[in-house]
């Protein structure tokens, strides 16, 4: 690139508005400054803090600047800054001013973070004002700049915040291939220039170039104001012409050097700029900290160039140019500290935490990354792993399935969170060491505690636990404290818990002990006064006879008890087998579904060879019946199996459901410890697969196909809500539960969580929340009140998936777009169809899309009473489908 180094040529910038500049007046109002730079109030970029203005003397004049201060010492105070994604890097400049605004003469110190990295500690005792400059490689459309209080050092303050676009490809030798790096400016020196700083408009990117006189030892400078032609095509940083036209040049010595102090030891990135502004072409070596980095570098007349160096683990910096031929010279230099950005927490963890925050109904202040630069409130981390979660005194009511996604947890504290029912959704937390569920209203141990193989502390005190302590707790070999105080537990404790090294606390229970005492009459265990009665010889003889008779009688009685016990056990086994047979006969009388033997199931699945799905209930296998029909076989885990009556009811319910848009129930197997359900197999896979799963890469669904799927699924749900008797709430509507056949007809599947209700049951209160994160109705979660409108909410999420072509919870985009409902709802309400799936762009009828989007938005309304019925949803979707068909017909006719 050829350009003319002529200062006057930059006057054009004095009269044009700079493109891409963001200038925030922190605590101030909007105004236009010199060179047409627009400063705006920071009110739209941060929600916390107080504002004031400070006036102070500066030389012979006074300055008055706004300040935003943050009295709350807890957490992060963050600015969310928009960034253009077409840029490769941006400059972030923050100015911090104290100047005794509070008349306390106590300048604060605080941390500054950009994204996940603490970049610096601002100490206004050292410099006031303090200017911090950072170069950030663009990898998102926004970033967070946060202030974090230092304990005992006052409250953070800020005066201004600037975002400036940098030249494309600039600073690439440091940032290229390393998107997890931030550059923090240490020095930017306009070598050889002594008449103040240079910035915009001389530098169109508004970098501040400091004058050279402050850096010793000082050498002669050389300045050219004339017209000079320079070839600078290889300088991607694009330094301003006014910087390149000056140079520090060796006067009489053999070397030219800069000795620069560094704030902190670390890795540094150095750029040296050279311009051939002399008719000579000097040659010299470049030495950094006594190490030769460039042995023979020549500055060619009329050429401009750069040298880039990275120095690792240094605490001081000396740059020396040693003469080889003619006088060494340098036009400018930049020095940056290289800051590594810590790895981010897993998307699964972030998704789970965001869902948990949403359903607490509280703003926990969780934004950006949970672990860096500092952990969120209520959280502790090890590196980028969330290892502890503390949510006491929050009305959770149940442990959401989402907690099970926090796989790195070592400590989970949910004490005093109004939990009820059974302990659930913790079985996947294999690393958990401490579990505190005390001071709740839990009634049952559940079936998952035995899976917590690394558990050391289990605190269940002050609950409503009933019955006996499960033997399975003895499997927790690392357990050292089990607190069961103040519950309603009875019976002997398992002997597997009576071991050295395990403390078991049991006070406050009706009858709980390691001894095999009877709990039929608790009062019999109370100590009574002992009374001594004198006995004569005759009585002693009679007593001996009585003792012998008693021993003999006791032995006979013990034998009798063993006989009775064996009889009862045998009778119970016969009764259990009789119950299963009776249940099978009862099911046969329905004449609605087939009863399979376990042998038949094993043959159909080829010994359970092909797994096609897995969930909390068990696994699903692909099978083939003797007549060639393909089936999906759902096998329940032992711990998820139902009692006989419950299983009969479930099979009866499934046998009654017959609709073209519901997956057909083919039969079942019910044998001791075996509960298996058999459904028709649909070869087209799930809707989720077609939208963003493996099938989406091979065949994408167009808009009319998506509407057809939506109509089919709505028909199935409408039958459940309004066509069957009793009516049924599905409870787990999601795109992976909408299956497609080979002709792309959709059917709703998986009624394992479904709930029957009559017209008298306008709502149903549950003690356990069932469903999938991202689809759960927030009102159902918070109130435990289940209605058909909960299905409508979940189906609304599916409609948004069809429109946007993405998952309900996704960490791939910006933090704002993580939750599909919260992201899509305001955009679609504003008619912003830019968020529609890219695959659908320019292929849909706007009226059809608008109608589908409108009903989807109503479905996901937070207030259940304002949501439409599924029948109304079906009507609107049919209308949208008809509009799209008409649009396609008109387009074909036009073509």
Swiss-Prot record:
The chain crosses the membrane at residues 545-565. Residues 606-888 form the Protein kinase domain. It catalyses: L-seryl-[protein] + ATP = O-phospho-L-seryl-[protein] + ADP + H(+); L-threonyl-[protein] + ATP = O-phospho-L-threonyl-[protein] + ADP + H(+). Residues 1-16 form the signal peptide. LRR repeats lie at residues 385-407, 408-430, 431-453, 454-477, 478-500, 511-532. Glycans are attached at residues 36, 50, 60, 140, 195, 234, 318, 416, 436, 462, 498, 521. It is a single-pass type I membrane protein. ATP binds at residues 612-620, 634. The modification Phosphothreonine is found at residues 767, 772. Its EC number is 2.7.11.1. The modification Phosphotyrosine is found at residues 679, 780. Residues 566-895 are cytoplasmic. The active site is at 732 (proton acceptor). InterPro entries: Kinase-like_dom_sf, Leu-rich_rpt, Leu-rich_rpt_typical-subtyp, LRR_dom_sf, Malectin-like_Carb-bd_dom, Prot_kinase_dom, Protein_kinase_ATP_BS, Ser/Thr_kinase_AS. One of its GO terms (cellular component) is membrane. PROSITE patterns: LRR (PS51450), PROTEIN_KINASE_ATP (PS00107), PROTEIN_KINASE_DOM (PS50011), PROTEIN_KINASE_ST (PS00108). Gene3D superfamilies: Galactose-binding lectin (2.60.120.430), Phosphorylase Kinase, domain 1 (3.30.200.20), Ribonuclease Inhibitor (3.80.10.10), Transferase(Phosphotransferase) domain 1 (1.10.510.10). One of its GO terms (molecular function) is protein serine/threonine kinase activity. It is found in: Membrane. Residues 17-544 are extracellular. Coiled coil: none annotated. Keywords: ATP-binding, Glycoprotein, Kinase, Leucine-rich repeat, Membrane, Nucleotide-binding, Phosphoprotein, Receptor, Repeat, Serine/threonine-protein kinase, Signal, Transferase, Transmembrane, Transmembrane helix. It is an enzyme of class 2 (transferase). Pfam families: LRR_8, Malectin_like, Pkinase. Belongs to the protein kinase superfamily. Ser/Thr protein kinase family. This is Probable LRR receptor-like serine/threonine-protein kinase At5g48740. It comes from Arabidopsis thaliana.
């Amino acid at each position: 690139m050829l350009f003319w180094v002529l200062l006057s040529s930059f006057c054009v910038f004095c009269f044009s508005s700079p493109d891409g500049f963001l200038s925030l007046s922190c605590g101030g109002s909007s105004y236009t400054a010199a060179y047409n730079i627009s400063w705006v109030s920071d009110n739209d970029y941060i929600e916390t803090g107080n504002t004031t203005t400070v006036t102070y003397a500066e030389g012979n004049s006074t300055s008055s600047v706004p300040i935003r201060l943050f009295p709350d010492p807890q957490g992060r105070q963050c600015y969310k800054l928009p960034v253009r994604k077409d840029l490769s890097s941006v400059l972030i400049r923050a100015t911090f001013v104290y100047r005794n605004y509070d008349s306390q003469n106590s300048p604060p110190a605080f941390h500054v973070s950009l994204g996940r990295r603490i970049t610096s500690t601002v100490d206004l005792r050292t410099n006031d004002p303090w200017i911090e400059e950072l170069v950030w490689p663009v990898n998102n459309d926004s970033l967070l700049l946060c202030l974090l209080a230092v304990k005992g050092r006052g409250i953070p303050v800020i005066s201004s915040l600037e975002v400036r676009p940098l030249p494309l490809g600039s600073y690439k030798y440091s940032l290229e291939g390393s998107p997890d790096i931030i550059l923090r400016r240490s020095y930017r020196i306009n070598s050889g220039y002594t008449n103040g700083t240079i910035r915009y408009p001389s530098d169109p990117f508004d970098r501040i170039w400091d004058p050279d006189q402050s850096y010793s030892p000082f050498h002669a400078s050389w300045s050219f104001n004339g017209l000079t032609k320079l070839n600078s095509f290889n300088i991607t940083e694009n330094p301003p012409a006014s910087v390149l036209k000056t140079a520090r040049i060796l006067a009489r010595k053999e070397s030219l050097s800069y000795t620069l102090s560094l704030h902190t030891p670390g890795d540094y990135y150095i750029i040296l700029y050279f311009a051939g502004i002399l008719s000579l072409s000097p040659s010299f070596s470049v030495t950094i900290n006594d190490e030769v980095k460039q042995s023979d570098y020549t500055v060619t007349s009329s050429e401009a160039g750069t040298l880039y160096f990275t120095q690792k683990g240094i605490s001081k910096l000396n740059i020396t140019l040693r003469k080889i031929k003619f006088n060494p010279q340098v036009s400018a230099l930049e020095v940056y500290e290289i800051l590594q950005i810590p790895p981010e927490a897993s998307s699964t963890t972030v998704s789970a935490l965001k869902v948990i925050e949403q359903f607490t109904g509280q703003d926990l202040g969780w934004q950006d990354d949970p672990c860096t630069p500092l952990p969120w409130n209520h959280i502790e981390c090890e590196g980028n792993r969330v290892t502890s979660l503390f949510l006491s005194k929050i009305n959770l009511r149940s442990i959401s399935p989402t907690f099970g996604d926090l796989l790195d947890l070592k400590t989970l504290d949910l004490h005093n969170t109004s939990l009820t029912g059974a302990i659930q959704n913790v079985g996947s937390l294999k690393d958990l060491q401490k579990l505190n569920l005390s001071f709740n209203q839990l009634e049952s141990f559940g079936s998952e505690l035995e899976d917590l193989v690394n558990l050391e502390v289990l605190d269940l005190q002050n609950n409503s636990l009933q019955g006996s302590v499960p033997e399975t707790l003895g499997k927790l070999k690392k357990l050292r404290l089990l607190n069961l105080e103040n519950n309603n537990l009875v019976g002997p404790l398992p002997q597997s818990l009576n071991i050295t090294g395990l403390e078991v606390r049991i006070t406050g229970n009706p009858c709980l002990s390691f001894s095999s005492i009877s709990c039929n009459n608790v009062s019999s265990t109370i100590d009574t006064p002992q009374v001594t009665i004198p006995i004569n010889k005759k009585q002693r003889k009679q007593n001996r006879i009585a003792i012998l008779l008693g021993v003999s009688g006791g032995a006979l009685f013990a034998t009798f008890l063993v006989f009775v016990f064996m009889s009862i056990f045998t009778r119970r086994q016969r009764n259990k087998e009789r119950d299963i047979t009776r249940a099978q006969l009862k099911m046969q009388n329905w004449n609605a579904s087939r009863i399979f033997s376990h042998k038949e199931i094993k043959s159909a699945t080829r010994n359970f060879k092909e797994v096609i799905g897995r969930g909390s209930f068990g696994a699903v296998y692909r099978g083939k019946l003797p007549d060639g029909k393909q089936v999906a076989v759902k096998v329940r885990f032992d711990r998820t199996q139902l009692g006989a009556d419950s299983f009969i009811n479930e099979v009866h319910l499934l046998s009654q459901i017959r609709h073209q848009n519901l997956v057909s129930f083919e039969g079942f197997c019910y044998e001791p410890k075996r509960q298996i359900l058999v459904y028709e197999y649909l070869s087209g896979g799930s809707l989720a697969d077609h939208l963003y799963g493996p099938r989406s890469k091979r065949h994408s669904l167009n808009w009319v196909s998506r509407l057809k799927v939506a109509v089919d699924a709505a028909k199935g749900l409408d039958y459940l809500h309004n066509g069957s008797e009793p009516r049924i709430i599905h409870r787990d509507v999601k795109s992976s539960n909408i299956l497609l056949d080979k002709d792309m007809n959709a059917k709703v599947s998986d009624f394992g969580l479904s709930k029957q209700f009559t017209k008298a049951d306008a709502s149903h209160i549950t003690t356990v929340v069932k469903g999938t994160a991202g689809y759960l109705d927030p009102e159902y979660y918070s109130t435990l009140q289940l209605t058909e409108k909960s299905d409508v909410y979940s189906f609304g999420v599916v409609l948004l998936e069809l429109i946007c072509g993405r998952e309900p919870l996704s960490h791939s985009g910006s933090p704002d777009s993580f939750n599909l409902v919260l992201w899509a709802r305001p955009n679609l309400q504003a008619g912003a169809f830019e968020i529609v799936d890219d695959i659908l762009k320019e292929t849909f009828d706007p009226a059809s899309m608008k109608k589908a989007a409108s009903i989807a938005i109503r479905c996901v309304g937070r207030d259940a009473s304002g949501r439409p019925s599924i029948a109304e949803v079906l009507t609107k979707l049919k209308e949208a489908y008809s509009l799209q068909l008409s649009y396609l017909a008109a387009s074909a006719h036009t073509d």
